[in-house]
Regions:
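Terminal interaction modules at protein C-ends
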Residues: 39-40
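Beta-strand/loop-dominated core regions that host nucleotide or nucleotide-derived cofactor-binding catalytic loops
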Residues: 6-29, 35, 45-111, 115-156
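Basic/polar, acidic-poor N-terminal "presequence/leader" segments
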Residues: 1-3
């Protein structure tokens, strides 16, 4: 097995928990390297960009394609935030998630974690960075819970 593939799977396991490395990065992934540093920058599955490696903190940012792929392979994924259908239309346009619209959140979520935003009925609507722990997301009625990085309608 390729050392780089083992490395990105290990990072995913650290970031998202056991089993996520293989679920997110199967053997068919293709890595794109930075021209300046020669390090991994983007990971593609087929023609779709699924993750970008952030060298400043050593973790991945996900795309909508990665979120859908990950939830299909690992439905018990612990880094999901479920929002109301009313909020889902705005989140899919790239708007932030407010705490009052959060129905449930994975117990492992901490501020700064990469999370998948799902609507209660319509599936993945975005990905972003958690700003609160999971208990606060469910308890608070004001404030931003997740800073949306990509909405399902805005992700190209």
């Amino acid at each position: 097995m390729d050392n780089e593939l083992r490395r990105i799977r290990a990072i995913a396991e650290y970031q998202f928990g056991p089993g996520s490395g293989m679920a997110l990065f199967p053997d068919e992934v293709r890595m794109v390297y930075s021209r300046n540093t020669g390090r991994i920058r983007h990971i593609h599955l087929g023609d779709a960009l699924i993750a970008t490696f952030r060298p400043n903190d050593g973790v991945f940012t996900l795309t909508i394609a990665a979120a859908e792929h990950l939830l299909a392979k690992a439905p018990e994924f612990g880094y999901t935030v479920t929002v109301t259908e009313d909020a889902a239309q705005f989140v899919s346009q790239g708007k932030n998630v407010f705490a009052k619209h959060v129905l449930s959140a994975g117990e492992k979520i901490r501020p700064g974690d990469e999370v998948i935003i799902v609507a209660e009925k319509s599936g993945v609507v975005g990905v972003g960075k958690a700003l609160l722990i999971s208990d606060e997301m469910k308890a608070f009625k004001i404030g931003v819970a997740v800073k949306t990085r990509r909405g399902s309608e805005t992700d190209a």
